[in-house]
A protein has these predicted regions:
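Ferredoxin-type iron-sulfur electron-transfer modules and their immediate structural context
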Residues: 1-154
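N-terminal Rossmann-like FAD-binding beta1-loop-alpha1 element of flavoenzymes
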Residues: 156-177
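Glycine-rich FAD pyrophosphate-binding loop
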Residues: 177-187
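Active-site-proximal loop->helix
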Residues: 189-194
């Protein structure tokens, strides 16, 4: 835990959004990221709880509490605060196949389960995640990483939506030969053929 008093020293501060009158003029992202030093301060607010409910992702009283992907939230928050961005990206990608769009459209169940939010505002986990993955892209960390050994198994994935592509990615990492089938003329599922393509950049992995 890089800064034990971070949640006491810093109030939650979010990315600044443009006015609605400006937003309706185009489909570009309308939130301006915080300066790097302020984003690191926001990461320092993570309390590194003994039981990190933010990454739990299990049903409590019939409702899912925390990240369903079990993202290692306290770990990469701490790495972000200590200026270890590359390590933070590696930790993020260990559990999340597509943080470039979960950091934009996810409902942030992690923040709803954040212990810091019991008596104040939760840690801005979603925006921290977005900062990390944007750093990874801008610094050239996001490169093809084919497995060193291939198995003799051939697997078909029906549908190229987020779950299908995530499944294909995981199977490919294990060395299997994966073929993705898609009925539409482009891959991405709802991310590219529904309203979300108006709110997400689609010129990266999808």
């Amino acid at each position: 835990m890089g800064k034990p008093t971070g949640f006491l020293e810093f109030e939650r501060k979010s990315n600044v959004g443009t006015s609605p009158l400006e937003r309706i003029k185009n489909y570009k992202e309308f939130h301006t990221p915080l300066p790097e030093n302020e984003r690191r301060q926001q990461a320092s607010r993570c309390m590194d709880c003994g039981v990190p409910f933010c990454q739990n992702g299990k049903p409590i009283m019939g409702m899912v509490s925390g990240c369903p992907l079990n993202n290692l939230v306290p770990e990469w928050n701490d790495l972000l605060y200590t200026n270890e961005y590359e390590a933070a990206a590696h930790r993020l990608l260990m559990t999340n196949n597509f943080p470039e769009f979960t950091s934009r459209v996810c409902p942030a169940l992690c923040e709803a389960a954040c212990t810091c939010g019991l008596n104040g505002d939760p840690v801005s986990v979603k925006e921290n995640e977005n900062f990390i993955i944007e750093f990874a892209y801008n610094s050239g960390l996001m490169q093809p990483n084919p497995p060193k050994v291939r198995t003799d198994k051939n697997i078909a994935i029906i549908g190229s939506g987020p779950s299908g592509l995530a499944c294909a990615d995981q199977l490919n990492k294990r060395g299997h030969n994966v073929t993705v089938f898609e009925k539409d003329d482009r891959i991405g599922g709802l991310l590219t053929v529904s309203y979300t393509h108006l709110t997400l950049p689609t010129n990266r992995e999808v």
